[in-house]
């Protein structure tokens, strides 16, 4: 039965009256709006009717390993198949949940030895994905692998039997799934991921790391179990989803429920914020609630956490979500929605089309708005606004606005505005504005503005007012011809402004400004600025500024005021020749300024002040040579050599050598050598060597060596060595060594602060604090505090798998319960019991351990 083109559900009781409601799926647009189902309730017609409001289904339990393989090697897909078949019967897409999880597992799986467990993970993923190949498009591959006590600084892995026996089980699971089913979307799914707790940031860090290491992950599932009085703000969840989008990941809200907690407005706000944030981010493709009616919720009926009541009738919060979808849903990718009246609308994927009565609108991807009596056809990416009586055709990327009586045709990327009586045709990427009586033709990428009686022809190119790629402004009687190129006012790529009597010819990519009587020829190139009496030779991409008597030589690379890619401004009598390059006022792409009597020659390159990638400023008597990527500033009498990417500043009498990416500042008498990425500051008498990525600051008499990514600060007499990713702070007499890893003050992933005489070594993920004289070692994710005199012996653990991983550590952290509310108790929503569970059985303050089933108890 249909009402106003939308499906409605009728509930009939013992009385004649009936309640009808619109279905969420009919207004969801391109969003999958789903529900978790339990096959045991499929015989209840009211339950099934309520499910018809959704267009996606996920099974609560029957598609988990425990529902498919209760006995080792014996696969029974009947339960999962029942859910899948019901979804197909109701026209719903089916979402797979979940392949690997530490909880709710049969004893044979949980108690297996490391090698058996590894093989079982591979076998289960392989056989399950093969069974549903071409049927289930999305699977949660790994569920809830991050520890509840993760504080947002890096992440801590949950110390489950999976991690303890197969530490790389997450990588193994995703790699196996991709190999078996290349076209299936692979998700990581977790709770407390929506931003209420710090764990959400740790989950983001963990997923980001998977992406950086090229682990084949396609999306992240935010479970979103919250309460009316404990929920993320809209800005928080919107920002979080947006950051996942920037990682190139798809986002699903997978298990949404909101405990009422006596606050109906708060519950409505939590549901609303989640849906609005999902709709606001194009990568958020699915929005699922965890259960149909309140009686079905794993939280219990008293929490009233779902969209339907115990009789499977929609609650007010259902209508709240429905109204949001009706007003804010993104358009469906392959369907069209037509408003009542005489309108016709055909919309291709990704297109927004709004047509008022009496109009016709056909829109390819893009946006089209047509007022009564008008016709508008917009190809992909184009925006068209047409007033009555006009016709407008816009190809992809073009914007066209036409006033009465005019005609405007815009090809892709072009913008065209035509006043009465004027004609304007713009090819792709060009912008054209024509006043009455003027004619303007713009080729792609160009911008053209012509005053009455003037003529302007623009060839293809960069950003230009006259010709494509170039910018040209011509006064009456002036002529301007521009060739294709970079950023220019006159010719493509170049910029030229010519006053009467002046001549200016600019080749592509350069910018030239010439005063009357002056001549300027600019070849494409860099940036050059030379003061009188100075000699400057700049190679491509470099920048050089030389005061009288100074010399500067720049190799190819970064930003340069002198060589190609620069700009040249020449006063009468001055000459400037610039070879091809980057952005420039004089030569294409470069910037060059030459005062009378000065000469400047610039070779092709990028944008640099001294040499490619480097910056050099030299006062009289100083010499400076900079290799690409580095920046060097030398005062009189000082010498400075910088390799690519390094920053070096040397005061008189100091020597400084900086490799790419490093920064070095040396005071008189000090020596400093910095490798790429590191930063080093050395006071008199101190020595500092920094490898790539590290930051090192050393006071007099101290020594500091920092490997990539590490930060080290050493006071006099202290020594500090930091490997990549770690942060180390050592007071006088202390020693600190940091291995690579996560976020840590001492070693990557760990945090270490050492007072004088103390030693601390931390492996990734661990947190360690050591007082003077004490020794402490921490494995990833563990927390340990050692008082003076304590020590641990190093232990070597070797795990042999498809790839052999060897980890050397100094101690093994412990995990276990503490008194009620303690830091090692399970966090809210965490597991606190169940058959075979060996984790903490107490809950942190504000929650209690509640029995869910024989396999699972949770802190609520």
From Swiss-Prot:
What Enzyme Commission number(s) apply to this enzyme? 3.2.1.8
Q: Which UniProt keywords apply?
A: Carbohydrate metabolism, Disulfide bond, Glycoprotein, Glycosidase, Hydrolase, Polysaccharide degradation, Repeat, Secreted, Signal, Xylan degradation
Indicate which residues are glycosylated according to the record. Answer: 295, 309, 359, 374, 390, 406, 845
Q: sequence repeats located where?
A: 375-382, 391-398, 415-422, 431-438, 439-446, 447-454, 455-462, 463-470, 471-478, 479-486, 487-494, 495-502, 503-510, 511-518, 519-526, 527-534, 535-542, 543-550, 551-558, 559-566, 567-574, 575-582, 583-590, 591-598, 599-606, 607-614, 615-622, 623-630, 631-638, 639-646, 647-654, 655-662, 663-670, 671-678, 679-686, 687-694, 695-702, 703-710, 711-718, 719-726, 727-734, 735-742, 743-750, 751-758, 759-766, 767-774, 775-782
Q: Tell me where the signal peptide lies.
A: 1-20
Give Gene Ontology CC terms.
Answer: extracellular region
* Principal location: secreted
**What is catalysed by this protein?**
Endohydrolysis of (1->4)-beta-D-xylosidic linkages in xylans
- Biochemical pathway: Glycan degradation; xylan degradation
Q: What is this protein called?
A: Endo-1,4-beta-xylanase B
Coding gene?
Answer: xynB
């Amino acid at each position: 039965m249909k009402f106003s083109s939308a499906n409605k559900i009728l509930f009939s009781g013992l009385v004649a009256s009936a309640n009808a409601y619109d279905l969420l799926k009919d207004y969801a647009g391109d969003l999958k709006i789903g529900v978790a189902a339990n096959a045991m309730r499929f015989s209840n017609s009211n339950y099934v009717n309520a499910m018809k409001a959704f267009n996606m289904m996920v099974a609560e339990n029957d598609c988990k390993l425990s529902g498919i393989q209760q006995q080792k090697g014996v696969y029974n897909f009947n339960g999962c198949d029942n859910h899948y078949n019901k979804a197909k019967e109701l026209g719903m897409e089916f979402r797979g949940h979940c392949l690997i999880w530490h909880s709710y597992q049969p004893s044979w799986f949980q108690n297996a030895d490391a090698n058996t467990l590894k093989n079982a993970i591979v076998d289960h993923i392989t056989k399950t994905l093969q069974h549903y190949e071409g049927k289930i498009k999305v699977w949660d591959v790994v569920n809830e692998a991050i520890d509840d006590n993760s504080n947002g600084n890096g992440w801590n892995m949950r110390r489950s039997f999976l991690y303890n026996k197969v530490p790389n089980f997450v990588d193994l699971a995703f790699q196996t799934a991709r190999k078996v089913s290349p076209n299936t979307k692979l998700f990581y799914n977790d709770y407390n991921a929506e931003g209420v707790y710090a764990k959400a940031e740790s989950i983001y860090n963990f997923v980001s790391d998977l992406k950086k290491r090229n682990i084949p992950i396609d999306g992240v599932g935010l479970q979103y179990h919250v309460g009316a009085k404990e929920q993320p703000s809209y800005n928080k969840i919107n920002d979080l989803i947006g950051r996942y989008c920037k990682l190139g990941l798809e986002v699903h809200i997978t298990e949404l429920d909101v405990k009422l907690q006596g606050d109906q407005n708060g519950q409505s706000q939590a549901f609303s914020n989640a849906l609005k944030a999902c709709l606001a981010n194009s990568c958020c493709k699915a929005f699922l609630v965890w259960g149909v009616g309140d009686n079905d919720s794993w939280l219990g009926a008293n929490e009233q956490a779902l969209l339907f009541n115990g009789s499977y009738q929609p609650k007010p919060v259902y209508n709240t979500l429905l109204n949001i979808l009706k007003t804010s849903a993104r358009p469906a990718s392959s369907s069209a929605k037509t408003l009542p009246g005489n309108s016709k609308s055909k919309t291709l994927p990704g297109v927004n089309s709004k047509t008022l009565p009496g109009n016709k609108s056909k829109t390819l991807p893009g946006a089209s708005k047509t007022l009564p009596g008008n016709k508008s056809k917009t190809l992909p990416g184009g925006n068209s606004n047409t007033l009555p009586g006009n016709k407008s055709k816009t190809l992809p990327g073009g914007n066209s606005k036409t006033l009465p009586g005019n005609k405007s045709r815009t090809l892709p990327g072009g913008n065209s505005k035509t006043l009465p009586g004027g004609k304007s045709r713009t090819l792709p990427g060009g912008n054209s504005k024509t006043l009455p009586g003027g004619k303007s033709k713009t080729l792609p990428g160009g911008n053209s503005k012509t005053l009455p009686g003037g003529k302007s022809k623009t060839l293809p190119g960069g950003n230009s007012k006259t010709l494509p790629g170039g910018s040209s402004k011509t006064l009456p009687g002036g002529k301007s011809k521009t060739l294709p190129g970079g950023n220019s006012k006159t010719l493509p790529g170049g910029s030229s402004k010519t006053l009467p009597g002046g001549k200016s010819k600019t080749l592509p990519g350069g910018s030239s400004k010439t005063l009357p009587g002056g001549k300027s020829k600019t070849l494409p190139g860099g940036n050059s600025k030379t003061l009188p009496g100075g000699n400057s030779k700049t190679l491509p991409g470099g920048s050089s500024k030389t005061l009288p008597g100074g010399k500067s030589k720049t190799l190819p690379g970064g930003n340069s005021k002198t060589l190609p890619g620069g700009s040249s401004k020449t006063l009468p009598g001055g000459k400037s020749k610039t070879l091809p390059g980057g952005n420039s006022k004089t030569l294409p792409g470069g910037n060059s300024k030459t005062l009378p009597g000065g000469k400047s020659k610039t070779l092709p390159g990028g944008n640099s002040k001294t040499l490619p990638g480097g910056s050099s400023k030299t006062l009289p008597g100083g010499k400076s040579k900079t290799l690409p990527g580095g920046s060097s500033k030398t005062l009189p009498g000082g010498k400075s050599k910088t390799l690519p990417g390094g920053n070096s500043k040397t005061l008189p009498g100091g020597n400084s050598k900086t490799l790419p990416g490093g920064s070095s500042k040396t005071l008189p008498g000090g020596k400093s050598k910095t490798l790429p990425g590191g930063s080093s500051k050395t006071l008199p008498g101190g020595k500092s060597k920094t490898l790539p990525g590290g930051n090192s600051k050393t006071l007099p008499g101290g020594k500091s060596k920092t490997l990539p990514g590490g930060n080290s600060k050493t006071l006099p007499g202290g020594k500090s060595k930091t490997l990549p990713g770690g942060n180390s702070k050592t007071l006088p007499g202390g020693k600190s060594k940091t291995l690579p890893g996560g976020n840590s003050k001492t070693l990557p992933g760990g945090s270490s602060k050492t007072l004088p005489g103390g030693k601390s070594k931390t492996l990734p993920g661990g947190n360690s604090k050591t007082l003077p004289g004490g020794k402490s070692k921490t494995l990833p994710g563990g927390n340990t505090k050692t008082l003076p005199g304590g020590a641990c012996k190093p232990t070597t653990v070797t795990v042999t798998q498809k790839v052999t991983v060897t980890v050397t550590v100094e101690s093994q952290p412990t995990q276990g319960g503490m008194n009620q509310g303690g830091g090692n108790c399970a966090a809210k929503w965490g597991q606190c019991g169940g058959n075979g569970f060996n984790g903490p059985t107490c809950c942190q303050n504000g929650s209690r351990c509640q029995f869910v089933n024989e396999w699972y108890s949770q802190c609520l």
